Structure formats: structure tokens, C-alpha cells
Swiss-Prot record:
Source species of the chain: Sorghum bicolor
Residues given in the record as [4Fe-4S] cluster binding sites: C559, C568
Protein function: PsaA and PsaB bind P700, the primary electron donor of photosystem I (PSI), as well as the electron acceptors A0, A1 and FX. PSI is a plastocyanin-ferredoxin oxidoreductase, converting photonic excitation into a charge separation, which transfers an electron from the donor P700 chlorophyll pair to the spectroscopically characterized acceptors A0, A1, FX, FA and FB in turn. Oxidized P700 is reduced on the lumenal side of the thylakoid membrane by plastocyanin.
Protein name, entry field: Photosystem I P700 chlorophyll a apoprotein A2
InterPro entries: PSI_PsaA/B, PSI_PsaA/B_CS, PSI_PsaA/B_sf, PSI_PsaB
EC number assigned by the record: 1.97.1.12
Binding site for chlorophyll a B3: M662, Y670
Cofactor binding note of this UniProt entry: P700 is a chlorophyll a/chlorophyll a' dimer, A0 is one or more chlorophyll a, A1 is one or both phylloquinones and FX is a shared 4Fe-4S iron-sulfur center.
Membrane topology classification: Multi-pass membrane protein
Main location: plastid
Family under the similarity heading: Belongs to the PsaA/PsaB family.
GO biological process: photosynthesis
Catalytic activity entry: reduced [plastocyanin] + hnu + oxidized [2Fe-2S]-[ferredoxin] = oxidized [plastocyanin] + reduced [2Fe-2S]-[ferredoxin]
């Protein structure tokens, strides 16, 4: 018999319709559902694919370094980071003739180029890279790592090198190795790089392999470490008039706790960063020796979980049974990993702009905006994925007998309470926030702005004051000069920190008012509603009041309206699908808020945000409409400009986004009819009918059409905002 796609499912391969192709693509990575799969082969396949993933990442980062070295302007950017625009790569084939060539020839380049808004120039500069040769060396090294990863992946698919199932199930050893080896050793190595290469580089000392062993990163070398005088490493830090990359104002300290920002680069002190990584390394190296493996010492996770019986018995059997439930469910583990990674990614977005670590990145406004938005969107997709795999866990892996009356079972037992509380919180936030916005809109429309309801965020202001912001006049903790909190750190990190918090030119603890109060609650509404949909989708995945157990229906069971027995109540796939819209919606509000707040800060007209953000028309008119003017003006009677490409992308993004609705607002029968009409016409058209297909064309399933619609909606939404964000920011600040 001929081999047809998909080879992993004989049932699908024999399907006579086009369903074979689409279902084949959809289940290609669902190894669990493949023919002849065993638990051991499942783990081995996933393990080997991780190497492929690493190879792709190394290749991609290698490409970044290579193209900047080849076509960029790294060496001239270093001479003047604030005024030279960093080049990502050349544009081979600029369409639209001479005007396009002129519009895109910038940054000192000979021909058309793309500008880098990723912050890689600032990062490479901070960590000690200085020449194009450095970049080429890095690119080649990463290419080598990529090749190594591919070989590793191939090797671990060979019979002799396939790890056994027991190896994959050995959670303690894996944790020890990942905590010590992955986090601990790599943090220690990074501290070493910062101390030996980056910090000398920031002081005008060029350290490479040829002089690595001759240049002492600290005048007394290891002396202070071996004699216990560790405080010496913090003495003589860089002065406040230090010029980054030169000896002027440079100190000799390597591990400090200065607090605040380097006055010239507006980024964290490199010696503070090294100190931070050393502390992280220390913690993780200890943490990686906590669990019991071959030596009979340390904690057994199973024993820990079994021993934790809640006092008084009011919380059931605590964590009994959880170890095996988690250790035997890849989906549970993936859900936990995605949830953690999602939170970390969002935290990265928040900290990259408020506590910038890379030299001069805080003054590259477009890069700041792009990085914040990028990391928030990534976080949103990762977090929704966590709940999707949580739902799949309940359907495929959850065993009620194994988890009787433990914390997991009790979550399911009182899911109605959880869901209804989330629902109540969402309703409260939604009605009150919208009510305030609409009231304020009406007041402005009728010319009585003084009748707006404006609420000062006093609790948030109090928290900012506790961290040392003096604007609001709260005399509390770090903003009180005679309290114990202030006195404890006054001679170490506090002067630097307090200067940073109270200087209004950076993004640390921005001054907040009624507009911030409202948009904060709008974002809270989005977060709670997204969470409600996702939590309900996971908790009801196996069954609900209407349908007690749907284990055999699988995950991608469609919600098909009340006529089909109320299946919407329990379709985990549909919950995920709805949640992604809410996730995108919420991140829209988050990024609008961040961007508008910062544009007014950077332009020095914060009153525009403060006055216009308290009503919806203000957001529509003074943020969206006002800032899209450059995009609408991308092509005009005077020819092209460097924003034209973003103007085109803005239009194209809207088009992709709108295409999504064609798939979202339609019935399956319509598609089937359309496809049969097209097939009929094709078969009766001369020349066209020379091309035949073997598979009978059938319409997409309900779930597939929703996926196609969702994909277009998401991609279009993000493209549109990306173009808006980059054009409106770079158009203002260059």
C-alpha cells in the first residue's frame, strides 16, 4: 500500500477527504495520539525534539549577530549610541524605486536598511562586545552550538542512546541538575563574564582570550575572597561622572550595592548586576543539592508532599497522591512550566523598562516600547497555553481514585464556588469601570468636565511612597527620613535608589492619578475575565452539571450550541478559544496604557495623558487617532518616507484581522456549499480541469474554522498594533 500522509495515523491516512491533510497537520505534534506510541517512546520523542528546538534558537541568534556584523553599524553606533540609529540588516530589494531607496538609507549606511528596535546593540555593548569581529566570533560559536544540538537530537533517537522511562521519571535528579547545573552554574558563569569582561569593558579595558589571564578584574585579585574581606570588592565604585566604556570616572569595585542608575547610561550599575547574578548563583547552587538521589541524603519530594497533612483535617488529605499525578502527566508538568514561564515573561516586560539593565536602552524609546509590547504578548500566549494543557491533563491524565480528597480533588469539588467568585469579580469590575468611563464621557460631551468622577489611587500612591517616592507627601517607610527602614540602607543602596525613584525622567514608579486608576481597573477586568474563562474551561473539561464525564470526547470537542445538548458548557477547546480573544483584548489595554503614558512622559507633556485618559473619547482621539496620523500619512502626494512600510503594514494588519471574521461568523454548512461550488466550477473549466485532486474537498470542521479565524484575528491584531507602535514612536523620537 502506498504511504500517505500522515504516516503516524493509519486511520487518517485512509480518509478519502481533505480532512486527512488538515487533521494530519493538527495532530502531527500530538504524539500521544499516534499509532504504536508507548509511554517510553512518547518521552523519548519529546526529549529529542528539545534538541531541535535549541538548534533553531541558536541558529536564529547566530543570524542576528551575523547580519549585524555583516550589514550593521555596530562600531559606529558605539561611538555615539544616543544619535546613531542601529541597523538590523540591509534591504536587498527596495520596491517602489528611487524614493524608497532614499527613504530607507539611514544610520550611515550605503543603501536601504532596516533599523533595529530589539535592543541587541545595547545588550552586546553592555556585555563587552566592541567590534564586528566580536560579533562574527559570537555568530560562529552559536552556529557550532546549533550543530551540536542537532547532533544531540539525532543521537538521542538512536536505540543505544535513548534514555529509559525511569530516567525521565526521576524528578529529584532532574531538579537537582536543572537547579544547580542550569541555573546555578550558568548564573555563576555569567557573573564571571560580567566581572572579567563586561565590567573592564565598561572602564575602557578590552579583555579577550589573548589577555584574559593577565588582566586582573580587581587590583587585589582573589585576596579579599580568601581572607574573608569581601567588602573590599565593593569599595571604590564607578563615580557619578563615569563615562561608560572609558577610564574617565571609572572605579575598581566589582560587586556593589549602589542602587539606582548610572547617570550617563540611565541603566543599572553593571557592578550591581554582577552582584545580583552571584547571589542568584549561590542560592541555586544550594537549592540544587536539596533533593534525595543516589546518596540517600536530602529531601524526597514524595515524602514532603505526603507529610504535609493540613492541621485540623479541614482541608482533606492535603498533597497525598500529587507526586505521582504530576510525575506521570506530561500535560500537568507542561501546564506548570508554561504558567511559570508566562508570569516570568510578563515580569521581564515590566522590569526591562522600569529597571533597564542595558546601557543607553532607556533613551531608545522605540526599542523600549517594542520590547515591552513584545514580552507582554508572548506572556499572554504562554499563559493561555498553561490552562489549555491543564484542561488536557484533566481529560487524559486525571485519575479520581489516585487523588481522593486531596487539594486537586477539592479544587474540582468546589469549582462552582471558584467560577462564580471569578464571575462576580469580573462583573463588578466591568460594570463599575465602564460606568465611570461613560459617565466622564457624557460630562465632557456636555461641557461640564468638572463633574467627572475622578478617583485618586491613594493605596497605590501609598505603596509607591513606602518605596521612597516623596511626591505624594506620605511620610512612610522609605519616604520617611527618620524611620528604621530608611536608616538601615542609608549608607548602602538607598541614596542611589531614592534619586532614581524621585527623578521624573525615568520609568521607575511613574506618578499616577485618576486616569491610571481607571485603566488599572479596566486591565483588572480583562485579567479576571480571561482567568474566569480559562479556569472554567479547565475545571469543567471532564464534565459539568449537564454532562457528568466526557473523558472519551477528548479535548477538541466543539461547542455547537444548545441544540446539541449544551456542549458549550464543557468544551475546553472553546474556553481556550474565547480566552485568547480576551487575552489579546487585555494586552491591548495594557500596551495602550503603557505606550500613551510613556509618549507623554518622553515628550514632556504628561498633562495630556492625565487629562484625556479619564474618558473613552480621550483614549480614542488623543491616543489612537492622534498617534496614527503618521501611518495614515505614509503615502502622500510628496512621495514616500521611512514610515511608509509601517503604513502598509498597518493596512495589511487590518486586512488580516478582518479576514478572521469570515471564518468566525459563519456556519459549517456555508463552507461546505461554497467548496462544492468551487470544486464543481473547477472541474468544468478548461485547462483548470487538467489538475485533479484525489481527496474529496470537505469544509473545515467547526473547531478548525474557529482556529483559522482565531489565527487571523490574532496575527492581524498584533501586526496592526506593532506597526502603529513602532511608527508612532519612531516618527516622534527618531
Amino acid at each position: 500500500m502506498e504511504l500517505r500522509f500522515p504516516r503516524f495515523s493509519q486511520g487518517l491516512a485512509q480518509d478519502p477527504t481533505t480532512r486527512r491533510i488538515w487533521f494530519g497537520i493538527a495532530t502531527a505534534h500530538d504524539f500521544e495520539s499516534h499509532d504504536d506510541i508507548t509511554e517510553e517512546r512518547l518521552y523519548q520523542n519529546i526529549f529529542a525534539s528539545h534538541f531541535g528546538q535549541l538548534a533553531i534558537i541558536f541558529l536564529w541568534t547566530s543570524g542576528n549577530l551575523f547580519h549585524v556584523a555583516w550589514q550593521g553599524n555596530f562600531e559606529s553606533w558605539i561611538q555615539d549610541p544616543l544619535h546613531v540609529r542601529p541597523i538590523a540588516h540591509a534591504i536587498w530589494d527596495p520596491h517602489f524605486g528611487q524614493p524608497a531607496v532614499e527613504a530607507f538609507t539611514r544610520g550611515g549606511a550605503a543603501g536601504p536598511v532596516n533599523i533595529a528596535y530589539s535592543g541587541v546593540y545595547q545588550w552586546w555593548y553592555t556585555i563587552g562586545l566592541r567590534t564586528n569581529e566580536d560579533l562574527y566570533t559570537g555568530a560562529l560559536f552559536l552556529l557550532f552550538l546549533s550543530t551540536l544540538s542537532l547532533i544531540g537530537g539525532w543521537l538521542h533517537l538512536q536505540p543505544k542512546w535513548k534514555p529509559s522511562l525511569s530516567w525521565f521519571k526521576n524528578a529529584e535528579s532532574r531538579l537537582n541538575h536543572h537547579l544547580s547545573g542550569l541555573f546555578g552554574v550558568s548564573s555563576l558563569a555569567w557573573t564571571g563574564h560580567l566581572v572579567h569582561v563586561a565590567i573592564p569593558g565598561s572602564r575602557g579595558e578590552y579583555v579577550r582570550w589573548n589577555n584574559f589571564l593577565d588582566v586582573l578584574p580587581y587590583p587585589q585579585g582573589l585576596g579579599p575572597l580568601l581572607t574573608g574581606q569581601w567588602n573590599l570588592y565593593a569599595q571604590n565604585p564607578d563615580s557619578s561622572n563615569h563615562l561608560f566604556g572609558t577610564t574617565q570616572g571609572a572605579g575598581t569595585a566589582i560587586l556593589t550595592l549602589l542602587g539606582g542608575f548610572h547617570p550617563q547610561t540611565q541603566s543599572l550599575w553593571l557592578t550591581d548586576i554582577a552582584h545580583h547574578h552571584l547571589a542568584i548563583a549561590f542560592i541555586f547552587l544550594i537549592a540544587g543539592h536539596m533533593y534525595r538521589t543516589n546518596f540517600g541524603i536530602g529531601h524526597s519530594i514524595k515524602d514532603l508532599l505526603e507529610a504535609h497533612t493540613p492541621p485540623g483535617g479541614r482541608l482533606g488529605r492535603g498533597h497525598k497522591g500529587l507526586y505521582d499525578t504530576i510525575n506521570n502527566s506530561i500535560h500537568f508538568q507542561l501546564g506548570l512550566a508554561l504558567a511559570s514561564l508566562g508570569v516570568i515573561t510578563s515580569l521581564v516586560a515590566q522590569h526591562m523598562y522600569s529597571l533597564p539593565a542595558y546601557a543607553f536602552i532607556a533613551q531608545d524609546f522605540t526599542t523600549q516600547a517594542a520590547l515591552y509590547t513584545h514580552h507582554q504578548y508572548i506572556a499572554g500566549f504562554i499563559m493561555t497555553g498553561a490552562f489549555a494543557h491543564g484542561a488536557i491533563f484533566f481529560i487524559r491524565d486525571y485519575n479520581p481514585e489516585q487523588n481522593e480528597d486531596n487539594v486537586l480533588a477539592r479544587m474540582l469539588d468546589h469549582k462552582e464556588a471558584i467560577i462564580s467568585h471569578l464571575s462576580w469579580a469580573s462583573l463588578f469590575l466591568g460594570f463599575h469601570t465602564l460606568g465611570l468611563y461613560v459617565h466622564n464621557d457624557v460630562m465632557l460631551a456636555f461641557g461640564t468636565p468638572e463633574k467627572q468622577i475622578l478617583i485618586e489611587p491613594i493605596f497605590a500612591q501609598w505603596i509607591q511612597s513606602a518605596h521612597g517616592k516623596t511626591t505624594y507627601g506620605f511620610d512612610i517607610l522609605l519616604s520617611s527620613t527618620n524611620g528604621p527602614a530608611f536608616n538601615a540602607g542609608r549608607n548602602i543602596w538607598l541614596p542611589g535608589w531614592l534619586n532614581a525613584v524621585n527623578e521624573n525622567s525615568n520609568s521607575l514608579f511613574l506618578t499616577i492619578g485618576p486616569g491610571d486608576f481607571l485603566v488599572h481597573h479596566a486591565i483588572a477586568l480583562g485579567l479576571h475575565t480571561t482567568t474566569l474563562i480559562l479556569v472554567k474551561g479547565a475545571l469543567d473539561a471532564r464534565g459539568s452539571k449537564l454532562m457528568p464525564d466526557k473523558k472519551d470526547f477528548g479535548y477538541s470537542f466543539p461547542c455547537d450550541g444548545p441544540g446539541r445538548g449544551g456542549t458549550c458548557d464543557i468544551s475546553a477547546w472553546d474556553a481556550f478559544y474565547l480566552a485568547v480573544f480576551w487575552m489579546l483584548n487585555t494586552i491591548g489595554w495594557v500596551t495602550f496604557y503603557w505606550h500613551w503614558k510613556h509618549i507623554t512622559l518622553w515628550q514632556g507633556n504628561v498633562s495630556q495623558f492625565n487629562e484625556s485618559s479619564t474618558y473613552l473619547m480621550g483614549w480614542l482621539r488623543d491616543y489612537l487617532w492622534l498617534n496614527s496620523s503618521q501611518l495614515i500619512n505614509g503615502y502622500n502626494p510628496f512621495g514616500m518616507n521611512s514610515l511608509s512600510v509601517w503604513a502598509w503594514m498597518f493596512l495589511f494588519g487590518h486586512l488580516v484581522w478582518a479576514t478572521g471574521f469570515m471564518f468566525l461568523i459563519s456556519w459549517r454548512g456555508y463552507w461546505q456549499e461554497l467548496i462544492e461550488t468551487l470544486a464543481w466550477a473547477h472541474e468544468r473549466t478548461p485547462l483548470a480541469n487538467l489538475i485533479r485532486w484525489r481527496d474529496k474537498p470537505v469544509a473545515l470542521s467547526i473547531v478548525q474554522a474557529r482556529l483559522v479565524g482565531l489565527a487571523h484575528f490574532s496575527v492581524g491584531y498584533i501586526f496592526t498594533y506593532a506597526a502603529f507602535l513602532i511608527a508612532s514612536t519612531s516618527g516622534k523620537f527618531g
